[in-house]
Regions:
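Short, glycine-/small-residue-rich phosphate/pyrophosphate-handling segment
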Residues: 78-123
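N-terminal beta1-alpha1-beta2 submodule of the flavodoxin-like/Rossmannoid cofactor-binding fold
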Residues: 1-74, 126, 130-152
């Protein structure tokens, strides 16, 4: 088993400008570390996307990377210029400072689309909310959730 870890916060991936280059050509006119990372995802059997939640969304470096996968969506899904096998597993791991579990719902659609352009299905989601809370606050939140479940 080989594992490769990429910290998108340590890359300088330019954001997609919606120039439509990928509608006519394979690839993107923006050249940065995106190509190398995307190539690794193409070769992977399992893709794990792990990120904190910022304002019900992915942080800027992750969002920029996901947006740049538009070229694969256009090539593989929209225009079907490239065949793709759906044989991979996608795993989403997120942390959220707040305790609102609705944040995970906001990330599911972009995550599913992201995984799909690499031939993966979102097979597992791991979500840890309340990371900004103290241990006592987390305990109280758990007790509130248990009480809500028991009152149903």
């Amino acid at each position: 088993i080989s594992v490769q870890h990429v910290n998108l916060f340590q890359t300088h991936i330019k954001p997609c400008t919606d120039c439509k280059y990928c509608h006519v050509h394979n690839g993107c006119p923006l050249h940065d570390s995106f190509e190398n990372i995307a190539g690794k995802l193409d070769e992977a059997d399992v893709i794990i996307l792990s990120a904190p939640v910022y304002y019900l969304g992915f942080p800027a470096p992750v969002k920029a990377f996901i947006d740049r996968t538009q070229q694969f969506f256009v090539r593989r899904i929209l225009f079907k210029r490239e065949k793709m096998a759906h044989t991979k597993q996608g795993v989403l791991i997120c942390t959220c400072g707040g305790s609102d579990l609705s944040a995970i719902e906001a990330l599911k659609a972009p995550s599913e689309m992201f995984f799909s352009v690499f031939g993966a299905e979102l097979s597992e989601t791991v979500y840890l909310a309340g990371t900004d809370l103290t241990p006592e606050e987390r305990r109280c939140n758990r007790m509130e959730l248990i009480e809500k479940e028991m009152s149903k």
